[in-house]
């Protein structure tokens, strides 16, 4: 009798949540594999560029697979159905990689090198460097389809890649912390100050890049001089 009552009053919503958990666990493996694939390609590009140009464009990489809770919240906020099939269709940032570069030029260099690969397809691009957000946020966002090889064969998974400089990352991290502490509500005065800081940091970003380029030209000139005189010294 107790068993019959249990079956009668069982919440059908619990079934959908449990099914979604199982779907998430399965799909998480695909998204995690996509992140590993992107990270491996970025590390290879950074290493090869360093060998050829004596400069590492990438400072560091960060990555994450969005949690089931975050997925559900984002789907609810957008008004989309809350299911993993809906998440696959409507969300492009379940798998995310953040590429923190040294200089602004490095951002577009890395993006172009990655997008030049035949099996990488561009889904979406948002250039917040050319067009910063109203709060001052700057970064290059691209969403790409990357192939991953699972036991059931080749699958494609979208990965959102945020590419920014160390300075942009510094501002974004602190700005997020300030807004979180203020529960998302900050005065116009603070908003203006944060935007001003973003502008100052941007100016510094470009100045640092100019300094680096100037030093690079000096080193390149020195190397050229060494290449010209070395054969003569060897002949002597």
Please annotate each region the language model reported.
Residues 94-100:
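Terminal, regulation- and interaction-focused segments at domain boundaries
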Residues 17-27, 55-65, 91-93, 150-162, ...:
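Short charge-dense sequence patches
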Residues 8-19, 41-59, 84-87, 143-152:
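Charged, low-complexity, helix/coiled-coil-prone segments
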Residues 12-14, 18, 36, 71-77, ...:
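Short linear motifs at secondary-structure transitions and domain/linker junctions
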Residues 25-71, 76-86, 93:
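Active-site acidic/histidine clusters and adjacent loop/turn architecture
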Residues 65-75, 101-106, 140-147, 227-236:
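Short, charged low-complexity intrinsically disordered segments located at boundaries
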Residues 88, 101-210:
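Long beta-strand-rich cores associated with HINT superfamily self-processing modules
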Residues 2-35, 42-48, 159-236:
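An acidic, glycine-/histidine-flanked metal-binding catalytic module
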């Amino acid at each position: 009798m107790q068993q019959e009552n249990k079956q009668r009053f069982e919440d059908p919503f619990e079934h959908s949540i449990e099914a979604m958990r199982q779907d998430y666990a399965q799909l998480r493996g695909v998204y995690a594999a996509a992140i590993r694939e992107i990270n491996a390609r970025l590390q290879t590009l950074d290493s090869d560029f360093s060998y050829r140009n004596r400069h590492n464009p990438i400072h560091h990489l960060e990555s994450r697979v969005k949690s089931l809770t975050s997925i559900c919240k984002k789907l609810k906020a957008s008004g989309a159905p809350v299911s993993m099939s809906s998440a696959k269709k409507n969300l492009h940032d379940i798998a995310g990689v953040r590429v923190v570069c040294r200089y602004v030029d490095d951002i577009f260099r890395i993006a172009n090198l990655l997008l030049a690969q035949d099996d990488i397809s561009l889904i979406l691009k948002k250039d917040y460097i050319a067009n910063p957000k109203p709060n001052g946020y700057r970064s290059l966002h691209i969403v790409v389809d990357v192939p991953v090889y699972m036991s059931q064969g080749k699958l494609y998974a979208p990965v959102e890649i945020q590419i920014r400089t160390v300075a942009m990352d510094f501002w974004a991290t602190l700005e997020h912390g300030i807004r979180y502490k203020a529960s998302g509500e900050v005065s116009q005065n603070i908003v203006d100050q944060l935007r001003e800081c973003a502008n100052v940091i941007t100016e510094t970003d470009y100045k640092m890049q100019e300094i680096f380029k100037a030093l690079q030209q000096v080193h390149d000139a020195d190397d050229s001089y060494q290449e010209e005189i070395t054969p003569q010294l060897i002949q002597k």
